[in-house]
Amino acid sequence: MNKRNLLLFGFVLIIFSSVLISSCGEDKVTAKSTQPASLSYHEEFDSMQRVIDMGWKGVNLSDPIGSQSWQQGSYVVNGLNGTKGGPFESRIASHSYKASASEHAYVNYFAGEGLSFLNCWLITPELSMKNGDIISFWTTTADPVSFPDRMQVWLNPTSNSYNVGRTSAETGDFTVKLLDINPNLSPTAYPVGYPSTWTKFEIVISGLPNGTIPQKHRVGFRYYVKDGGPGGTVSDEIGLDDFDFISQ
C-alpha cells in the first residue's frame, strides 16, 4: 500500500471511530433520560415482609398488650371455632389476590391480652401528599359479625414521623382524624356497623399546610377498641387490602 492510500485509510478510520464514539455517547445520555416516577402508590399486601421493607410500620400500644399486631392475613376455610381464645383461624379471605387468600393486612383481638383497650396502628410509608390527593382502601370484618370492630384513619399533617403517642388517649403527630368506622361498636350491618364484606372507602386530602405543594406525610390505620381483647365483649378481626394513594 503506497503512502497516499495509507494516509487516506487512516483518515477514514479516524472519522469512523469518532462517529462510533459519538454514537455510543448519545446512547448513554438517552438511557439516563427517564420520566420522573409517579407519586401515586398502590399496595396489595401480598407480602407483609415486603410491605415492612417498603416503609410500612406496625405499632401496638394496646393495654395490656397482646401477642399479635398487624400481620399477614391467615385465612382458613371454615376455620373459626366461634368462641374467643386460640388458636385463631381467620374467616377473612383477601379482597384480591394472586396466589393466596391471605394476601391482605390483618389484625385481630390478640393484639391485646385479657380485657384490653386495643390500640394497634399500621402506618404507611412516606407519601408525597398535597391537598386534593386521594387515599382509598378496602376493609372488612368477618361475616357473620360475632364481636363488633372499629378502625380509625389518621393523618400526620406536619411531618413524616411514625410518632403515634404512647397511650390509647394519644395520637402523637397524627392529629387529623380522616375517618372513624363504627365508632359506637354497633353489631349491626354497615353503614351503621363495620362492613362484613369487603367495602371501599375513599378520602380526599384537605387541610395540609403545604397546600398544593407535595410534601412527605404518613397515614395511620388504627385498630381501636375499648373493652376488647380475648376477655372482652367486643373486637374480632379486620382485614385491610388494596390501598391506593392517588396523586392528583
Say what each PLM segment does.
Residues 68-88, 170-196:
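Surface-exposed intrinsically disordered loops and tails
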Residues 133-185:
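Extracellular ligand-binding interfaces
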Residues 45, 122-143, 151-155, 214-228, ...:
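Extracellular beta-strand-rich recognition modules
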